[in-house]
């Protein structure tokens, strides 16, 4: 499949879970993909699995110097970036390993854990977009897709700092849209639904509990997403919040190929 015909896509947090599924779907549809992640070895392995159209990049989205270096690597390899997928994130299990069975009140959350989640998700989105947008404006256009969560998760009991981080991404995305109005750079928010097999959920959580997080009509398990049939769907990549249908791989290729009007 060459639906995306060589467009240049940088995916953060692309070494596992949803990020890996998005990278695989994009590569299968013909995109050139930069697989970015904190662990250099995992990034190299993940990129190798996607084939010659993918290149790895070690990236800590919280670190401005790391962000600048990763964008520079993409420019050196491709000459530009057509699409940025801000997917990198840290789940609740790093703050409270038993968050599903024993919600932790916000006043018991360690400040260091709060900062780590928020800096990875919100500050990371900001730093990546801040570095990429001037490049996209100079080249005549581009797309940014910020991965967030549904509103119910944002305000769920015991979901500090994960919920506030998602809310921050949504607010940041809306400001990006306003600031980029009239340009050819578009911004979307993608809401994937339950992350049941991505490392976000503790290993001891039973399958029944995982199943409750995942609506088959909305999203498939991550290891199946790259195999789903991708359909080209027109989208309006501006103010809309996109809900994944038939798998996040479908949604990502749809956004990548949609008309910018």
Regions picked out by a protein language model, each given a short descriptive name:
Residues 31-45:
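Conserved glycine-rich Rossmann-like NAD(P)H-binding loop of the short-chain dehydrogenase/reductase
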Residues 69-76, 95, 100-108, 112-119:
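Active-site Tyr-X3-Lys motif and surrounding loop/helix of classical short-chain dehydrogenase/reductase
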Residues 40, 59-71, 111:
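The beta1-alpha1 cofactor-binding region of Rossmann-like NAD(H)/NADP(H)-dependent oxidoreductases
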Residues 182, 189-191, 208-249, 253:
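C-terminal helical subdomain
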Residues 90, 102-113, 143-168, 173-174, ...:
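Catalytic loop of short-chain dehydrogenase/reductase
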Residues 129-130, 174:
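A short, exposed helix-loop element centered on a Lys and neighboring polar residues
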Residues 15-16:
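Conserved glycine-rich cofactor-binding loop
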